[in-house]
Curated annotation (Swiss-Prot):
InterPro entries: 2-IPM_HCS-like, 2-isopropylmalate_synth_dimer, AIPM/Hcit_synth_CS, Aldolase_TIM, LeuA/HCS_post-cat, LeuA_allosteric_dom_sf, LeuA_bact_synth, PYR_CT
Positions with a binding annotation for Mn(2+): D14, H202, H204, N238
Pfam families registered for this protein in UniProt: HCS_D2 (PF22617), HMGL-like (PF00682), LeuA_dimer (PF08502)
Subunit note: Homodimer.
Record organism: Citrobacter koseri (strain ATCC BAA-895 / CDC 4225-83 / SGSC4696)
Cofactor(s) needed for function: Mn(2+)
Organism phylogeny: Bacteria, Pseudomonadati, Pseudomonadota, Gammaproteobacteria, Enterobacterales
PROSITE patterns the record matches: AIPM_HOMOCIT_SYNTH_1, AIPM_HOMOCIT_SYNTH_2, PYR_CT
Name of the protein this chain belongs to: 2-isopropylmalate synthase
Annotated stretches, region: Regulatory domain: 392-523
Length: 523
């Protein structure tokens, strides 16, 4: 009988560290709910002590996610653990994940400590975390470069202190699969109380071996794998969860383990993470790349037509990728749009049907036919922009030519006011952005601009993703239209609204902190 491998997702913690712009609470919650729907066992959603925003994100997700265990990260520091527990206490059950470095290099140069002191600190902090929850995970940072006997001492002590999960990270992606599997086997041989904990692994992809190392560890007895969707993360990224999950499914014959993941949600979750995080998926990416199931060789095409298993070890349908695209027109009613969304696996809570249908009709009038990929793109934008907007694009016009300086006129709704400005720029998009800067006086600096087609043909929707710098913080914006200049304008307005919301959140957090301080003085 096969054993279960626990899937621990760290997209919203380790994965987010790689992003050019921080995610909003709403964006993090949207990803968390998708991960819950996909069936991850544990999701690590933040580092609460790092900022008030991270604390709020962890608390919000812990309050709303019910079918996955929510986890927060904490160093082996009292305040970290206390703040993590405070952010998580709204959940029925939660996990605290605490860590400390164990390699000689980290202990000597980073911690300026000794192995004995590290073990003493680990024991104390695991016990402190156990005061808040029975579910405590302990990580030996840089375990991949820690001598096996030292590692075994730390692991044994952490288990005795009450850690239920012991995580063995290859923090810098240094080890080879046969080497990393040997570390796990070595721990099973050396740690007498190892049967009292689940052994977990957290691998990085610096040498492109994150997934290989994770699978080698599973083969050696690890029963939890940590990683991120699409492999996002610091430097070269984390172990790619969807690759590990599908490798376990496809090669169950040799690994003899399984997960409780709903595989049909992999594709949609991957796409959502890509869009929200503004990190495009390479076409040749395993499992979820656009070319992962493409066959261009004549020999391969002939073989697939005769029997798909000749060249496909898994099907697109097994990850939820429906290759049959159905089209709707402007004559299609609301019920038809809702029915198609239902067939694609969307719940009514994931989009506003009224707003989606209005956007669908406008697009159908322009394109004639609206395909599944159009609907999914509209639903994504619909979800991103469903919050009240302080700024709204009312009108824009651009004059530009090969020998002319681009000039843009923009009208922007700012709260209850309508403001208008005109500006010149280096092309139509820059002219619009200069006009918007004049209206808002925000002085936003564009850091990154990318355009992607959502669909095929000259009338495909164009999605513009931008990253902008404002007052030392980076904000992400997205816009969607058949006109890329309009998409660009909408993306900048999305940035404006994200800046405004961030300021409102900061005001609210300051108000709460002040009230808390006032209450202390009263007592």
């Amino acid at each position: 009988m096969s054993q279960q491998v626990i899937i621990f997702d760290t997209t919203l913690r380790d994965g987010e560290q790689a992003l050019q712009a921080s995610l909003s609470v709403k964006e993090k919650l949207q990803i968390a709910l998708a991960l819950e729907r996909m069936g991850v066992d544990v999701m690590e959603v933040g580092f609460p002590v790092s900022s008030p925003g991270d604390f709020e994100s962890v608390q919000t997700i812990a309050r709303q996610v019910k079918n996955s265990r929510v986890c927060a990260l904490a160093r082996c520091v009292e305040k970290d653990i206390d703040v993590a527990a405070e952010s998580l206490k709204v959940a029925d059950a939660f996990r605290i994940h605490t860590f400390i470095a164990t390699s000689p290099m980290h202990i000597a140069t980073k911690l300026r400590s000794t192995l004995d002191e590290v073990i003493e600190r680990a024991i104390y902090m695991v016990k402190r975390a156990r005061n808040y929850t029975d579910d405590v995970e302990f990580s030996c940072e840089d375990a991949g470069r820690t001598p096996i006997d030292d590692l075994a001492r730390v692991v044994e002590a952490a288990i005795n202190a009450g850690a239920k999960t012991i995580n063995i990270p290859d923090t810098v992606g240094y080890t080879m699969p046969f080497e990393f599997g040997g570390i796990i086997s070595g721990l099973y041989e050396r740690v007498p109380n190892i049967d009292k904990a689940i052994i977990s692994v957290h691998t990085h992809d610096d040498l492109g071996l994150g997934v290989g190392n994770a699978l080698a560890a599973v083969h050696a007895g690890a029963r939890q794998v940590e990683g991120a969707m699409n492999g996002i993360g610091e430097r070269a990224g984390n172990c790619s969860l969807e690759e590990v999950i599908m490798a376990i499914k496809v090669r169950q014959d040799i690994l003899n383990v399984h997960t409780r993941i709903n595989h049909q949600e992999i594709w949609r979750t991957s796409q959502l993470v890509s869009q929200i995080c503004n990190m495009p998926i390479p076409a040749n990416k395993a499992i979820v790349g656009s070319g992962a199931f493409a066959h261009s060789s004549g020999i391969h095409q002939d073989g697939v037509l005769k029997n798909r298993e000749n060249y496909e070890i898994m099907t697109p349908e097994s990850i939820g990728l429906n290759q049959i695209q159905l089209n709707l027109t402007s004559r299609s009613g609301r019920a038809a749009v809702k029915h198609r969304m239902d067939e694609m696996g969307y719940k009514e809570s994931e989009y506003n049907l009224d707003n989606l249908y209005d956007a669908f009709l406008k697009l159908a009038d322009k394109k004639g036919q609206v395909f599944d990929y159009d609907l999914e793109a509209l639903a994504f934008i619909n979800k991103q922009q469903e919050e009240p907007e302080h700024f709204r694009l009312d009108y824009f016009s651009v004059q530009s030519g090969s020998n002319d300086i681009a000039t843009a006129s923009v009208k922007l709704a700012c709260g209850d006011d309508i403001k208008a400005e005109a500006a010149n720029g280096n092309g139509p998009v820059d002219a619009i952005y200069q006009a918007i800067n004049r209206i808002t006086d925000y002085n936003i600096e564009l850091v990154k601009y990318s355009l992607s087609a959502k669909g095929h043909g000259k009338d495909a929707l164009g999605q513009v993703d931008i990253v902008a710098n404002y007052n030392g913080r980076r904000f992400h914006g997205v816009g969607l239209a058949t006109d890329i200049v309009e998409s660009s304008a909408k993306a900048m307005v999305h940035v404006l609204n994200n800046i405004w919301r961030a300021a409102e959140v900061e005001k609210e957090l300051q108000r709460k902190a002040q009230n808390k301080e006032n209450n202390k003085e009263t007592v």
